[in-house]
Amino acid sequence: MVFNVRESTRGTRREFPHEVEVTDHVWIPMSDGTRLSAKLWIPKGATVHPVPAILEYLPYRKNEFTALRDSIRHPYFAGHGYASVRVDMRGCGDSEGILTDEYAKQEQDDALEVLDWIGKQDWATGSVGMIGKSWGGFNGLQVAALQHPALKAIITLCSTDDRYADDVHYKGGALLASDMLWWASTMLVYNARPADPAHVGGAWRENWLERLEKTPPFVEEWMRHQRRDGYWKHGSVCEDYSAIKIPVYAVGGWADGYTNAVFRMIQNLKGPKKGLIGPWAHEYPEVAVPGPQIGFLQECLRWWDQWLKEEETGIMDEPVLRVWLQDAVPPKTDYHVRPGEWVLENSWPSPNVQEKAYYLASQQLSEEPGQGTETLMTHQHHGLYAGVFCPFGQEGDMPSDQGIENGLSNTFTSEPLVEELAILGFPKMQAKLLSSSKRANLAVRLSDLSPSGTSKLISWGQLNLTHRNSHEFPEDVPVGEEFIVTVELDAIGYKLPKGHRVQVSLSPVYWPHMWPTAEEVELTVVKDKDTRLILPDYTNTTEEAEIVPFERPETAAVMEREVLRESGRTREIRHNTVTNEWILDDFSDEGCRRLPANGLEYGSTNQNIYRITEGDPLSASVQCDWTLTVGRGEWQTRLESTSTMKADERKFYVSSQLRALEGDVVVYDTTRNFEVERDFN
C-alpha cells in the first residue's frame, strides 16, 4: 500500500510531553483569493507559549488518502512541542483552485504564503521546518531555495535535486517508459477526486466539475520537453545549490529510485547538511522495507530541536553521511530485511573510495584491456525482469534473478574475487562504440554472480546516445565511426564476498525502463583500453565506537480504520509464441478502507500493461488503468481512467481518458489525444 501504514517492528507511543489539539480543516487564504485547506496538530497551551512549526505540503488529500500515515507522524511531532501543519496543495483535496503540473511556480508561491500565514498565528514562534517524502521532499528543497525567512531547516526524503536526471520522466535522456505514463495517469485520476462536502459544503459538486474539466494530463507537458531545457531546470535545485542556505537533512534508500541526489547534495550544498541512506524503498525509515527500520522520528526531533528550538542535540557533531552498506543476498522480488552495517563518512567524495577498473574481454572482465570488437545482442524484451523503477516495498517490486536477462545481453564476468569487494558510490561504464544508426540507446546492468549461479542486480544505468555529450543539446550518433560514451549507474552501497564474481551486461534495449529507438540498431563495442567498467572500491574505516545507534522505531498510534477490501498485487510476464509478443502485466489492488473518525471510505486499483513484439521496436506500447473510489454513506464517487502511449518513426501518441461518476451517474467522460514529434528519442 503506497499510502497505508504497514505492519512493522515499530513501537507505538501513546503518551507525550504535550497534549495535542487537532483541527481537521482550516482555510489558509492566498493573495489571489484561492483558499488552501490545512489540518493542524497544536500542542495545548501554544497560544500562551508559542512553538515552532513543521509543515508538510502535498497534493495527496489529507482527509483520507494520507490520513493513516499522517496519524503516526504529525501527532508525534506535536506531542513533542511542535505545531504540525499538513496542507493540501492548490487543486487537491479540500483546497480550491487547479493543480496544473508538478512543481509549478504557483505551487512554490503558495508555499511562501503558507509560511507567511503560519508566522502570523498566535501559536507560532515564527520558526518553521518543512518535511516531506517524494513530492513533499521535492518542494521542500525548492522552497528552501527561495529563502523565506521563516523557513529554518528541512528534511527531504526520496527526492532529487535534478528533475530531468532523477525522476519518473527521463533517465539518461531516454524516455522512462515504465513510469512516465504511469505517473501521469496516477496524478490525472488522483487530481480528479472531489473535495469533501463536510468541509466545503454544497459547492463541492461545482468545484469538482471545474477540477475535472481544467486539470490537464501532465504527460502532455512532459512530452513537449524531451531534453533538459528550462522546463526541467525550474525546480531543479542543482542549478544553484548556493541558493539553499538553511540546513538540509537528505534521506534516501537503496531500494528506492531516488537515492543519487543524496550524494550530490552532500557534495554541493554549502550550508549545514546531513545525509542518510538505508536499505529502504520509497517510504519513511521507521516503517520502510527492506529493514532494518530505525527510530527516524526521534532523529527528526534531534534535527528540529537543533534548528527550530536552537537546542544543542549533538546531531551536527556526527559525520555528515551515514550509509547502510549492504551484504550480498540471493535475488528475490521482495525483502523484509537487508543485512549489512552502518558506515560513516565525514565528506563526499570520500578519500575511502578509489576507482577499480575492469576491461571487457571475451565474455570476461579482465584487469588488462581486451582486443577486438563485439556486436551487442538486440532483444526487445530485455529488461522485463528489472523490477520497478521506484519500489514502495510491495511484493514483486525488486529485480528477479538476472540469469534470463544475461542471456539476452552481452554479459562479461570476472574471475572469482580473492577478497571481499565493497563498492560505495556511482559505478560507471565507459565504452567505445560503433553504431549503425543516428539513434541508439545503451543500457548497462551491474550484477553479483554468486558461487551457486544466481545473479543479483546491484545497479543499472541507461543512456540515450544522442545525449552522450549533453542532455540539453543532443546530437546525432556518428554512424560507422568510433565514439566513446560514459554511462553512470545508480549509486549503490554493496559488498561482494570473496568467491563471488562481478558481472556487467550491455544492451541497446531495456524495456520497459527505456523506450526503444524507432528502428533496431546494430551497436558494436570496441574492447580496448577505452572500454572499461569503473567501480567505486570502498575501504570501510568506520570504528564501531563512532556510530551513535539509532533509537528503536516508534510512532504515534495509527488512527482506527476498517478494512472493507484487502489489498493485493500480481506482476506477470506473458509470451505469445505465435506473435512473439511479450507482455508485462502489473496489477495492484490497494484495497478499500473506512475511517470511523470521519466516515470516509476510499479505495483504488491500478493495472499497467507493457507490450512489445520481438524484432519490432515500434510495437512498444503502455496502457495504465486506474479506478478510485471515495465517499461517505450515500455520497459516493468513482473515478476511472485509461491512458495509453505508443509511437511510430516520427511521433509519440498519447491518449488520456477520464470518467467520473456520482453514485451510478456519469457526470464527466472525456478523452484527450495528444501527439508530439520524437526529439532525439
Regions found by a protein language model. Give the residues of each.
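C-terminal, loop-rich substrate-recognition/catalytic regions characterized by aromatic stacking residues
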Residues: 10, 286, 290-661, 665-681
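Active-site-adjacent alpha-helix of alpha/beta-hydrolase-fold enzymes
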Residues: 261-273
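N-terminal cap/lid segment of alpha/beta-hydrolase-fold proteins
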Residues: 9-49, 413, 417-419, 473
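Glycine-rich nucleophile elbow surrounding the catalytic serine of serine-hydrolase chemistry
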Residues: 133-142
